[in-house]
């Protein structure tokens, strides 16, 4: 039985298979038969800032840890070691943490003290007296004047104490609005 030869492909030897990357990118790399040298030529790149002569390696690429920060604290402040020791002493695991100190709750029986006196509302039809100069009229109608009559305190009255609902006008303001001019 005669031996038959396998036909070879008609492709010439110097033609390479097409690569997915551009040829210009491949042309400047050095290829060799060993895979280790190929990977070392393509993977490892110099790290640093480029300049005219080549690459200058930056300092932090080879350092295992960051350098210590310069001591810039003010002379009166404690160091971080002292602060951390103080914090560790106050937050020791042996004693249970104390609850945070809260402000004492306001009593239900004491009325809240107003920070400012409410202004007096005058009826629009009320006109100042004719014999007073305008400077005194302006000064006496000022809501911050000490001559304003304050609202009657509910604790001084003999009647039962009632609270004003939120949004409703206090009794002194509503009476001064609804009162007819003298």
Curated annotation (Swiss-Prot):
Major site of localization recorded for this protein: host cell
GO cellular component annotations of the record: host cell cytoplasm; host cell nucleolus
Residues covered by region (Disordered): 1-26, 90-182
Basic residues bias: start-end ranges: 1-14
Motif Nuclear localization signal, and RNA-binding (RxRE) in this chain: 2-19
Bias type Polar residues, positions: 127-150, 172-182
Comp. bias (Pro residues): 96-117
GO MF term (any one): RNA binding
Any Gene Ontology biological process: mRNA transport
Entry keyword set: Host cytoplasm, Host nucleus, mRNA transport, RNA-binding, Transport
Region of interest (Homomultimerization), residue spans: 57-71, 124-132
Annotated localization: Host nucleus, Host nucleolus; Host cytoplasm
Nuclear export signal, short sequence motif: residues: 83-94
Quaternary structure (record): Homomultimer.
Family, similarity comment: Belongs to the deltaretrovirus Rex protein family.
Function in brief: Rex escorts unspliced gag-pro-pol and singly spliced env mRNAs out of the nucleus of infected cells. These mRNAs carry a recognition sequence called Rex responsive element (RxRE or XRE) located at the 3' region of the long terminal repeat (LTR). This function is essential since most HTLV proteins are translated from unspliced or partially spliced pre-mRNAs that cannot exit the nucleus by the pathway used by fully processed cellular mRNAs.
Domain remark text: The RNA-binding motif binds to the RxRE, a complex secondary structure consisting of four stem loops and a long stretch of stem structure, present in incompletely spliced viral pre-mRNAs. This region also contains the NLS which mediates nuclear localization. These overlapping functions prevent Rex bound to RxRE from undesirable return to the nucleus. When Rex binds the RxRE, the NLS becomes masked while the NES remains accessible.
Identification of the protein by name: Protein Rex
């Amino acid at each position: 039985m005669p031996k038959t030869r396998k036909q070879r492909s008609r492709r010439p030897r110097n033609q390479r298979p097409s690569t997915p990357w551009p040829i210009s990118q491949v042309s400047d790399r050095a290829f060799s038969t060993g895979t280790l040298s190929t990977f070392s030529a393509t993977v490892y790149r110099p790290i640093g800032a480029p300049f005219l002569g080549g690459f200058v390696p930056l300092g932090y690429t080879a350092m295992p840890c960051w350098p210590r920060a310069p001591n810039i604290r003010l002379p009166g402040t404690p160091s971080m070691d002292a602060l951390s020791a103080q914090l560790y002493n106050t937050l020791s695991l042996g004693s249970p943490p104390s609850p945070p100190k809260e402000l004492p709750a306001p009593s239900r029986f004491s009325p809240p003290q107003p920070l400012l006196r409410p202004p007096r509302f005058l009826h629009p039809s009320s006109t100042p007296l004719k014999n007073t100069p305008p400077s005194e009229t302006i000064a006496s109608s000022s809501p911050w004047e000490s001559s304003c009559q304050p609202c009657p305190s509910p604790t001084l009255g003999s009647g039962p104490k009632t609270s004003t609902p939120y949004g409703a006008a206090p009794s002194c303001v509503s009476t001064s609005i609804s009162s007819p001019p003298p």
